[in-house]
Amino acid sequence: MIVCFITFTIFHKNRIELAHQNRIGAKKKFAIHDYSKEKEQQDDDDDPDYLVSAIPEDTPHIPYKPLARPMEKILERSREYYDLMAKRRTVRSFSTEPIPQEVLDNIVKTAGTSPSGAFTEPWTFVVVQDPEVKLAIRNIIEDEEEINYSRRMSRQWVTDLKPFATNHIKPYLTDAPALILVFRQTYSWRADGKKKMHYYNEISVAIACGFLLAAIQYCGLVALTSTPLNCNTRLRDLLSRPPNERLELLLPVGKPHEDVTVPDIKRKNLDEIMINV
């Protein structure tokens, strides 16, 4: 369910941003690195020298022996895991207590175990703990969100958000001890300089985000799933990310504030989301 929500949100956000950029004729500028000499994206399928697999064709296949468990134990673990994940909530008020670096390393490593199209692993996880950088991120997002709420977002969209008590002011971006920004790599470059396509990069990154949220919940932290509208270029420049990367998700991560509250809402029942055939 986490993955489905993230996938829909990412696709919806991308369509809105693309439409907006087309209207305003937005031009991308990269303040930190000079990518002016970057090779143009082109289809090299007609070039015989290009038709080399992303990983060696003779990559050996090895036995796979996951831990064997009796079905009774599998059932027990499925119940325990559901009970844990059912407690996950989106939180907008965070404790400022720092997170050990090893915890952040482990949850990102867990996200990196996600499957991806043709094993391209098209993701970059930028973990921000520096207070000045967090403030710069907050300023960018609040600038754009003020415009989003007043002009870009439909009245129905804004109305639908009212029960969640959210607006263009985002204190959690500086309160949370860490921000994890997930960037999607649309392509990369092979060692020989040829472009390496990242197939199904959107769904691959969406699945990885689901893994990331599950890891955050499992270790006892909380997060907010945020998809900053029209912030991609400015945040990418701020964090020195290359032009083949696009921001897909921003997660403030930490412990919940001691006075945090969440909306009293219920998830759909199993019979509303599952069909057995």
How does the language model describe each region?
Residues R88, I107-G112, T186-D237:
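Small-aliphatic-rich amphipathic alpha-helix that forms the alpha element of a beta-alpha
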Residues E40, L51-A54, E121-V205:
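Glycine/small-residue-rich phosphate/adenosyl-binding loop
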Residues T110-G112, P163-H168, L235-D237, V260:
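Glycine-rich, charged/polar anion/phosphate-binding loops
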Residues R234-E248:
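Short, electropositive alpha-helical surface patch
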Residues H61-L67, Y82-E97:
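Generic N-terminal amphipathic, Lys/Arg-enriched alpha-helix
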Residues F8-E17, K27-D44, L51-Y64, R69, ...:
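C-terminal helix-cap and adjacent tail motif
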Residues V91-S114:
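An N-terminal domain-cap segment
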Residues P115-F119:
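Glycine-rich phosphate/pyrophosphate-binding beta-alpha loops
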